[in-house]
């Protein structure tokens, strides 16, 4: 009899401990969800890292293709913008090797708008995708046949919008345009593509560094904080988590 009472007490104690653990886990999950919702809120997060670090600051993202922006900064751009940063996203190429510039540019703007970044904050330099432009060879857009900067219907390339003419496809002109767009907006923080195995990633990474070398020599008082980031693509059967784009960007 006494043994049965002891067993029942032991089972009751185990059950109480188990229920306490379950309640503790649920409490942690609720707190996590609450804080996550704050991060996703359109109002931003008061007194957060983003508020203290980026409020009233200028942030510029410089990438080759119309998906690299999400790969290197998709998690940080929305809270930066929501907490008062002036965000600009600069695409160096039209991503037009396999599809039209319009398709890639529309996708980019639509994706950024879903993250809260308006279309007017997006800049297209209008250079070709997948060429040997960076090593001094003649370059043409695969989809349009053009040999100068351009943008899809309803969009403008930066050089034409700023100077009234299109820029020929040369490595030097890309460096010039990156230098120009940085000096025009003078961002406090720059997130730029890093050097990897992709031809355009390498080319834009080097072009950015050449542009920054010029800027730092000319403008000794301008010293933005620069973060170089890799744009990593998934390989193999990763369809569950891969971005589904019309263009199926490489």
Label the predicted regions.
Residues 13-20, 26-206, 212-221:
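Active-site beta-strand->loop->alpha-helix modules in alpha/beta enzyme cores, enriched
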Residues 217-243:
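Short, flexible loop segments at boundaries between secondary-structure elements
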Residues 117, 240-247:
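Charged/polar, low-hydrophobicity segments characteristic of intrinsically disordered regions
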Residues 47, 246-250:
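Extracytoplasmic/luminal low-complexity segments enriched in Pro/Gly and acidic/polar residues
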Residues 1-13:
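N-terminal Lys/Arg-rich, disordered targeting/topogenic segments
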């Amino acid at each position: 009899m006494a043994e049965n009472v002891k067993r029942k007490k032991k089972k009751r104690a185990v059950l109480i401990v188990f229920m306490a653990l379950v309640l503790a886990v649920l409490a942690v999950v609720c707190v996590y969800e609450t804080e996550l919702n704050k991060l996703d809120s359109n109002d931003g997060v008061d007194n957060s890292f983003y508020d203290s670090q980026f409020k009233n600051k200028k942030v510029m993202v410089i990438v080759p293709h119309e998906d690299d922006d999400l790969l290197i900064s998709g998690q940080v751009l929305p809270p930066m913008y929501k907490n008062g940063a002036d965000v600009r996203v600069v695409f160096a190429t039209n991503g037009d090797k396999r599809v039209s510039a319009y398709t890639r540019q529309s996708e980019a703007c639509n994706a950024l708008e879903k993250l809260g970044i308006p279309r007017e904050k997006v800049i297209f330099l209008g250079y070709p995708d997948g060429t040997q432009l960076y090593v001094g060879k003649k370059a043409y857009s695969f989809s349009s046949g053009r040999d100068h900067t351009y943008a899809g219907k309803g969009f403008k390339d930066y050089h034409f919008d700023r100077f009234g003419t299109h820029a020929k496809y040369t490595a030097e002109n890309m460096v010039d345009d990156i230098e120009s767009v940085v000096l025009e907006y003078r961002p406090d923080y720059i997130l730029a593509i890093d050097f990897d195995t992709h031809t355009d990633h390498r080319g834009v990474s080097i072009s950015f560094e050449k542009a920054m070398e010029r800027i730092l020599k000319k403008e000794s008082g301008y010293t933005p904080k620069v973060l170089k980031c890799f744009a990593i693509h998934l390989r193999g059967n990763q369809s569950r988590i891969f971005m589904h784009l019309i263009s199926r960007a490489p």
